[in-house]
From Swiss-Prot:
It holds the Pfam family Exc. This is Prophage excisionase-like protein. It comes from Escherichia coli (strain K12). To lambdoid phages excisionases. SUPFAM superfamilies: Putative DNA-binding domain. One of its GO terms (molecular function) is DNA binding. Keywords: DNA recombination, DNA-binding. The lineage of its organism: Bacteria, Pseudomonadati, Pseudomonadota, Gammaproteobacteria, Enterobacterales. One of its GO terms (biological process) is DNA recombination. The gene is xisE.
């Protein structure tokens, strides 16, 4: 079973020298740039040991004139405002 590592532990394992700073890793975690995504547990962000940085994934543009059903689908099934 894969372990959940703190961002610092993950960076030390992935980068042999000159890892990103902790604040940069936290920003990446908040922006969902890890695959699988990082999870916040208490005060710490944790990622699976096999996690990778994937960069910005494309998100669909939701227009106000789109149908309500399409807006719901594009917003991951959550209710529209």
């Amino acid at each position: 079973m894969l372990q959940m590592l703190t961002l610092e532990e993950w960076a030390a394992e992935k980068y042999r020298s000159n890892p990103p700073s902790v604040s940069t890793l936290r920003r990446y975690a908040k922006q969902n740039l890890f695959c699988p995504p990082a999870m916040k547990q208490g005060r710490l962000w944790r990622v699976r040991e096999d996690a990778e940085l994937v960069g910005e994934l494309v998100t669909p543009v939701i227009k106000k004139n789109d149908s309500l059903l399409l807006q719901r689908i594009l917003s991951n099934g959550s209710q529209t405002a």
